[in-house]
C-alpha cells in the first residue's frame, strides 16, 4: 500500500529522503486487515458527507495544506470552504503534501504554536 499511496500524499523532500525504503525486491504485499482503521477509512471515505454548515462555526479554525497532496489538494475547493468559515486562518506549507506532521514536523509544529498563540483566552 505504501509503495502506491506514498507518492500521492507525501511531498518531494520527504519522498527524496525515504526513496530507498520503497519498491524493494523482497517486499511482501499482503491484503489489508478488514478490521483495521486504515481499511475502514479507505473503503468508506468516498461515502463521507462533507456538506456541512461551515458558516455556523464559531471557533477559530486553522486550515493547513500542502500543495503536493495529489489526492485531496484542490485549491478551488480549499478557497471555497475557507470562504465559508467565519474565523479561518490558512497556511500552506510549500514543500509538503498530505502527511504534514510526518513530512515537516518542526515547521508544522510552529504553525500550530503560532495559531495557538493567536487565540484569545
Give residue spans per PLM region.
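Residue-level signal for the nucleotide or nucleotide-sugar donor/cofactor binding architecture
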Residues: 33, 72, 76, 103
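Conserved alpha/beta-hydrolase catalytic His-Asp/Glu region
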Residues: 1-55
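Alpha-helical elements of Rossmann-like donor-binding domains used by nucleotide-donor carbohydrate transfer enzymes
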Residues: 4, 24, 40-44, 76, ...
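Short beta-strand/loop motif that positions the catalytic acidic residue
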Residues: 57, 63-65
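Catalytic active-site module of serine/aspartate enzymes centered on a nucleophile-bearing elbow/loop
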Residues: 87-121
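Acidic catalytic loop of the alpha/beta-hydrolase fold
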Residues: 68-72, 98
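Active-site acidic short loop of glycosyltransferases
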Residues: 58-59, 87
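Short alpha-helix in the alpha/beta-hydrolase fold that links the catalytic acid
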Residues: 59, 73-82
Amino acid at each position: 500500500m505504501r509503495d502506491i499511496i506514498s507518492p500521492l500524499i507525501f511531498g518531494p523532500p520527504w519522498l527524496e529522503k525515504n526513496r530507498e525504503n520503497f519498491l524493494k525486491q523482497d517486499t511482501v504485499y499482503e491484503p489489508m486487515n478488514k478490521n483495521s482503521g486504515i481499511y475502514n477509512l479507505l473503503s468508506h471515505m468516498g461515502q463521507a458527507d462533507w456538506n456541512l454548515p461551515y458558516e455556523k462555526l464559531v471557533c477559530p479554525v486553522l486550515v493547513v495544506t500542502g500543495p503536493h497532496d495529489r489526492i485531496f489538494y484542490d485549491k478551488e475547493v480549499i478557497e471555497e470552504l475557507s470562504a465559508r468559515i467565519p474565523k479561518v486562518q490558512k497556511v500552506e506549507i510549500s514543500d509538503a503534501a498530505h502527511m504534514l506532521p510526518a513530512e515537516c514536523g518542526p515547521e508544522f509544529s510552529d504553525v500550530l504554536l503560532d495559531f495557538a498563540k493567536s487565540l484569545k483566552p
